[in-house]
């Protein structure tokens, strides 16, 4: 049997008039919609029941047939078929036009397809279509030229001169249709190919464009005449509804207005033609019909848009598809779903990591069908109907059944904005009183949630498969690591950190110091009986099983540390157990801060896996909350002690500033130097004040404890509270040289307060803009990477890339070890000292092996990379390496493209927006933060361009009064000279040796220049390290592989330069594998291969250049993408994720991949019996 959703590809094309008539159930002849008295549709109107089907289920228009039993009968009185009203969503009608009109997409798009095909300019075409000029269709014997334009006067003169029937000229779409019908596509393509060989410059570009359109029509089987419309399809009435409002008025979709205008003008034109009206009147009516159809298809594309009440432009068919509110993004890519709810969240410190609290009434509504089924199964209710009644009346026995139903049925919690995949996680629900969802405190970081009124949505996975996926892949206890860098995301925060810090502190001279206890329990008992203090240094005998023998030893520790270590595995590697002295020590024998907790979790995950780690995390959470309550840390004004040394430091700074001012006034230093020295001095003074403050604070000072543990606040905030606020930035981003001397404890004066608010407002405005920009960047990244999925185990390539540490100046931004962990080698790695092979080729490098490689002194390693992967679509598991979220090798079917896009986009909001101004020097305003990342991914020419050397060689600098020039002398004697513009800073000095592609002046490099000089590999390396620099400077870690995936997608296309004997067109962009395939075909027959160069496309261009027209159309420029796809008759192979979501199939990733499709799931009750239960409408 043919299944509707079982297809492999989807094709788009132009519709012929015959096809449109075939779709239609009848012709719409009248502009009427609904009779205002009877509220029934008018016959032959836009809502006609005869054409589109009945308004009410199983009921004809006149009421002769009512009820299901007449199903399928066509009423003999009113001609309406008795069927479901739902058919009004699918049945189409049509309008027969009295005169053909052109389709605005093909005439007006850029480039104009109609214009290219006929070799006419769009302006000339417009004159003909809108009845301003005649066009010669057949000159016959006259000296007129074919396709020559004649205005009214010239036409009259020609008719007078040559006679009435001596030539044929026409106007409007009819004339164009006739000319389009005469075009011979095959001959035209041949002729254009001949011309292409001789032409150059602009002419060549135009020929290539024309050839592309001609070949598209020839190959796709579209007839050029179909760009002119004779029949207009009318979409089903329920997709353009008309609803009655309270006051008896009607609200209608804009499309009805647009259709009405078309029908009115069409009918008027028919009348005029029947009456044989004068030519000029008919022509005017035809022009108006053309404009009405234009407005229906794409309102506002040409001339002023048709407006409705209140001067609002009407939404045309094109607008229905476009933009965020269009069909693609609103209804196809994201739908509202049943079995979901939302509520405010509150903290649930008593929950386990895999649990969430679900309000009772919400749970009952969400699990209603399950509860009803269970009630019937248990015999509490006799049938579904009575079960439904029980649930609706909320009888007491319903709650017991609900408890049973939700055990082992995970739910998904989601918080908007979902910036990465941890924004949706699965939890085991626990019923709670009240109306708020309870969330585990450790899940907050992943969701970026807090409890100041945030809301979250709950979704119920229905099928057994969905439940299994939620339980195994999405349970919060398993998502401990961040997919972007593989570090733990569930690190305890705030109170939990403070409690752990308090617990592991020690205080000299505390009560009971130096006492000795026979075991842990005795020590804890002494603490609980208030004999000793929790922070006192004591001696305890601890017992350990070593090689099956119980041994003991005395260690020096505190009760707090003993309690803390009870919940921590004692083999995490923080203590060297081989050492006799350390054999019995506690694993965590240091002061625990947020940072060290991260390391503890990391180690635990690597050694014990997620399950044990999540148990440990729950224990740390419980301890943290308990002991931060016992510690009772508070904050008071008296805790902020201003260091007495501050005033001396300020006085000393003032004196230095005076000296600098004097030097400047005497002309020893320039304005820039003075400014920089003043800023430097104040920065240093502020630091000194802050250091003095930190030294003077007691270790048990609550503010110090909070900052030091990482629970809340930081050194810089304490500096502002009790030290001095220091330098502030002005809204332009320039640092003001007037520092704020006071701290908040002392209080700011009016000027200081004003200066500090000045810069702060800029920060707030930036944050608001940043969110939108960052979201848009994520959307483009997702679009360009969405079809990158791990498709196979090993692509078998021998290629790879060399990696070494990334440096910015002398500072190491990313270490080599970090770049090696979780990657496969592309060649044997040999120890340079001993000559032994450390790692063989194609081997996996875990942290231990990576350590070995780095400690052998190797600086450069060749690894497998997504860049060099030979997979036709997606990447292979070996080129990708480790899955950052699980710290294991990646599985086939993982959607690594989406993960990469999310990993880069999610921290986007943390990046800065501003351009830093370093003084007033030209050319040194380098873009940083989010704009810089965008500039790189869009492969734009950057602001503040650096001059780049094109050859290897030695530098010679020449300075004259007028200009500076740099000469690079190559090895083969060739010399390149570069003029240095005023104000640029040189990066090289006289006599330096530089490589091709190195910067001569400071600034950013245009990635396209690097592509030309160093090739694709150089450009890829440059983009990767530049993006890494931006993120690392903001303290964000992103693994290289995510950037590799994106940059790979940017360099996938080849620009064809010469076509050789292939079918490729010069100047077109084509996928690199298609290019190689076309050449391989030609090679078999010994023909001439095509030549091309790899291109670097920005992410927007790369996303639009995808093979899938559905994916591209749902991204941006919808009409342009669909116009092109229709003319080419494109076939969408449905390879990526978006296109499959759009047509409603399972996505080809994860368990949706073909290789996993056949799996059968067994639930606990071995056999699933599908008892047919009656469904109550």
From Swiss-Prot:
Glycosyltransferase recorded as keyword:
no
Q: Which InterPro entries match?
A: DNA-dir_RpoC_beta_prime, DNA-dir_RpoC_beta_prime_bact, RNA_pol_asu, RNA_pol_N, RNA_pol_Rpb1_1, RNA_pol_Rpb1_3, RNA_pol_Rpb1_3_sf, RNA_pol_Rpb1_4
Origin species, per record, is Clostridium botulinum (strain Alaska E43 / Type E3)
- E.C. code: 2.7.7.6
Cofactors: Mg(2+); Zn(2+)
Q: How is the cofactor bound?
A: Binds 1 Mg(2+) ion per subunit.
Which Pfam family name is an example for this entry?
RNA_pol_Rpb1_2
Q: How does it assemble?
A: The RNAP catalytic core consists of 2 alpha, 1 beta, 1 beta' and 1 omega subunit. When a sigma factor is associated with the core the holoenzyme is formed, which can initiate transcription.
Described by its record, this protein's role is as follows: DNA-dependent RNA polymerase catalyzes the transcription of DNA into RNA using the four ribonucleoside triphosphates as substrates.
Q: What is this protein called?
A: DNA-directed RNA polymerase subunit beta'
What's a Gene Ontology MF term here?
A: DNA binding
| Catalytic activity annotation | RNA(n) + a ribonucleoside 5'-triphosphate = RNA(n+1) + diphosphate
User: What residues bind Mg(2+), as annotated?
Assistant: 450, 452, 454
Checking SUPFAM superfamilies in the record gives: beta and beta-prime subunits of DNA dependent RNA-polymerase (SSF64484)
């Amino acid at each position: 049997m043919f299944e509707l959703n079982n297809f492999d590809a989807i094709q788009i094309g132009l519709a012929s008039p015959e096809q449109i008539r075939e779709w239609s159930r009848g012709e719409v002849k009248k502009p009427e919609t609904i009779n205002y008295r009877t509220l029934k549709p008018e016959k032959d109107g836009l809502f006609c029941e005869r054409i589109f089907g009945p308004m009410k289920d199983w009921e004809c228009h006149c009421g002769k047939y009512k009820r299901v039993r007449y199903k399928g009968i066509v009423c003999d009185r009113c001609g309406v078929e008795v069927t479901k009203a739902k058919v009004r969503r699918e049945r189409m009608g049509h309008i027969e036009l009295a005169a053909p009109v052109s389709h605005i997409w093909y005439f007006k798009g850029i480039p104009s397809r109609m214009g290219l095909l006929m070799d006419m300019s769009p302006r000339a075409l417009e004159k003909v279509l809108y009845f301003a000029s005649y066009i010669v269709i057949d000159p016959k014997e006259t000296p007129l030229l074919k396709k020559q334009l004649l205005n009214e006067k010239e036409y009259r003169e020609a008719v007078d001169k040559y006679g009435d029937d001596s030539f044929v000229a026409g106007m409007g779409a009819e004339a164009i249709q006739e000319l389009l019908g005469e075009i011979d596509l095959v001959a035209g393509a041949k002729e254009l190919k001949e011309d292409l060989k001789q032409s150059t410059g602009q002419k060549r570009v135009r020929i290539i464009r024309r050839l592309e359109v001609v070949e598209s029509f020839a190959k796709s089987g579209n007839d050029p005449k179909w760009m002119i419309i004779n029949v207009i399809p009318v979409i089903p009435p329920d997709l353009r509804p008309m609803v009655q409002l309270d006051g008896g008025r009607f609200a209608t979709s804009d499309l009805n207005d647009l259709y009405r205008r078309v029908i009115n003008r069409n009918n008027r034109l028919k009348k005029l033609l029947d009456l044989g009206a004068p030519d000029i009147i008919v022509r005017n009516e035809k022009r108006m019909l053309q404009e009405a159809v234009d407005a229906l298809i794409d309102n506002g594309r040409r001339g002023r848009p048709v407006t409705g009440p209140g001067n609002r432009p009407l939404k045309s068919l094109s607008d229905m598809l476009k933009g965020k509110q269009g069909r693609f993004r609103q209804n196809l890519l994201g739908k509202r779903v049943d079995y979901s709810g939302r509520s405010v969240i509150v903290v649930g410190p008593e929950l386990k990591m895999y649990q969430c609290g679900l309000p009772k009434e919400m749970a009952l509504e969400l699990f209603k069908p399950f509860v009803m089924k269970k009630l019937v199964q248990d015999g509490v209710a006799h049938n579904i109907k009575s079960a439904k009644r029980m649930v609706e009346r909320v009888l007491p026995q319903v709650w017991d059944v609900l408890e049973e139903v939700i055990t082992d049925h995970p739910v998904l919690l989601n918080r908007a904005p979902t910036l990465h995949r941890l924004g949706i996680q699965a939890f085991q629900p626990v019923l709670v009183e009240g109306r708020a969802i309870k969330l585990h405190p450790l899940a907050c970081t992943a969701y970026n949630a807090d409890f100041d009124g945030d809301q979250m949505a709950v979704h119920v996975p229905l099928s057994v498969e969905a439940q299994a996926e939620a339980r195994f892949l999405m349970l919060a206890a398993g998502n401990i690591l961040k997919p972007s860098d593989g570090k733990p995301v569930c690190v305890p925060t705030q109170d939990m950190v403070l409690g752990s810090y308090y617990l592991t502190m020690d205080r000299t001279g505390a009560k009971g110091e130096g006492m000795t206890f026979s075991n842990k329990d005795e020590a804890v008992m002494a603490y609980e009986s208030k004999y000793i203090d929790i922070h006192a240094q004591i001696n305890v005998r601890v017992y350990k099983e070593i090689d099956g023998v119980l041994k003991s030893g005395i260690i020096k520790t505190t009760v707090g540390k003993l309690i803390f270590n009870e919940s921590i595995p004692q083999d995490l590697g923080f203590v060297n157990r081989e050492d006799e002295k350390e054999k019995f020590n506690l694993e965590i024998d240091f002061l625990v801060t947020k940072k060290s907790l991260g390391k503890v979790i990391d180690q635990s995950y690597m050694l014990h896996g997620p399950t044990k780690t999540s148990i440990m995390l729950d224990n740390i959470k419980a301890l943290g909350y308990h002991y931060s309550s016992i510690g009772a840390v508070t904050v008071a004004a008296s805790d902020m002690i201003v260091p007495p040394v501050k005033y001396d430091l300020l006085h000393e700074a003032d004196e230095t500033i005076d000296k600098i001012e004097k030097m400047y006034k005497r002309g020893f230093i320039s304005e820039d130097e003075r400014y920089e020295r003043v800023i430097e001095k104040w920065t240093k003074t502020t630091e000194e004040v802050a250091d003095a403050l930190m030294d003077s604070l007691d270790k048990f000072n609550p503010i110090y404890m909070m900052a030091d543990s990482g629970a809340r606040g930081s050194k810089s905030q304490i500096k502002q509270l009790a030290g001095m606020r220091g330098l502030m930035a002005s809204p332009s981003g320039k640092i003001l040289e007037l520092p704020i001397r006071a701290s908040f404890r002392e209080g700011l004066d009016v000027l200081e307060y004003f200066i500090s608010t000045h810069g702060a407002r800029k920060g707030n405005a930036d944050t608001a803009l940043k969110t939108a920009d960052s979201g848009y960047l994520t959307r483009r990244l997702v679009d360009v990477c969405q079809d990158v999925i791990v498709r196979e185990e090993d692509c078998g390539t021998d290629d790879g890339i060399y990696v070494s540490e990334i440096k910015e100046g002398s500072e190491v931004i990313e270490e080599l070890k970090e770049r090696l962990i979780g990657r496969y080698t592309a060649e044997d790695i040999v120890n340079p000292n001993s000559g032994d092979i450390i790692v063989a080729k194609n081997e996996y490098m875990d942290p231990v092996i990576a350590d070995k490689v780095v400690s052998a002194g190797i600086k450069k390693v060749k690894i497998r990379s997504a860049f060099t992967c030979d997979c036709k679509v997606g990447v292979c598991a070996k080129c990708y390496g480790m899955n950052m979220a699980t710290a294991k090798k990646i599985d086939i079917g993982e959607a690594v493209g989406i993960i990469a896009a999310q990993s880069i986009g999610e921290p986007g909001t943390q990046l800065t927006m501003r351009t830093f101004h370093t003084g007033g020097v030209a050319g040194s305003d380098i873009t940083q933060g989010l704009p810089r990342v965008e500039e790189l991914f869009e492969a734009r020419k950057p602001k503040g361009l650096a001059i780049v050397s094109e050859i290897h060689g030695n530098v010679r600098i020449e300075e004259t009064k007028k200009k500076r020039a740099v000469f690079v002398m190559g090895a083969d004697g060739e010399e390149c000279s570069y003029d240095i513009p005023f104000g640029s800073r040189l990066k090289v000095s006289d006599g330096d040796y530089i490589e091709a592609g190195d910067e001569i002046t400071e600034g950013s490099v245009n990635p396209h220049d690097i592509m030309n000089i160093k090739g694709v590999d150089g450009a890829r390396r440059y983009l990767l390290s530049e993006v890494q620099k931006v993120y690392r400077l903001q303290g964000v870690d992103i693994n290289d592989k995510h950037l590799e995936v994106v940059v790979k997608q940017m360099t996938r296309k080849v620009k064809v330069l010469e076509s050789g004997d292939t079918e490729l067109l010069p100047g077109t962009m084509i996928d690199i594998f298609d290019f190689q395939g076309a050449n391989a075909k030609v090679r078999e027959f010994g023909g001439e291969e095509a030549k091309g160069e790899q291109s670097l496309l920005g992410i927007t261009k790369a996303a639009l250049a995808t093979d899938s027209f559905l994916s591209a159309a749902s991204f941006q420029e919808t009409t342009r993408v669909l116009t092109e796809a229709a003319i080419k008759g494109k076939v969408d192979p449905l390879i990526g994720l978006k296109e499959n979501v759009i047509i409603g199939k399972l996505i080809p990733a994860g368990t949706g991949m073909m290789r996993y499709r056949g799996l059968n799931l067994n639930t606990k009750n071995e056999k699933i019996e599908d008892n047919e239960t009656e469904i109550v409408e």
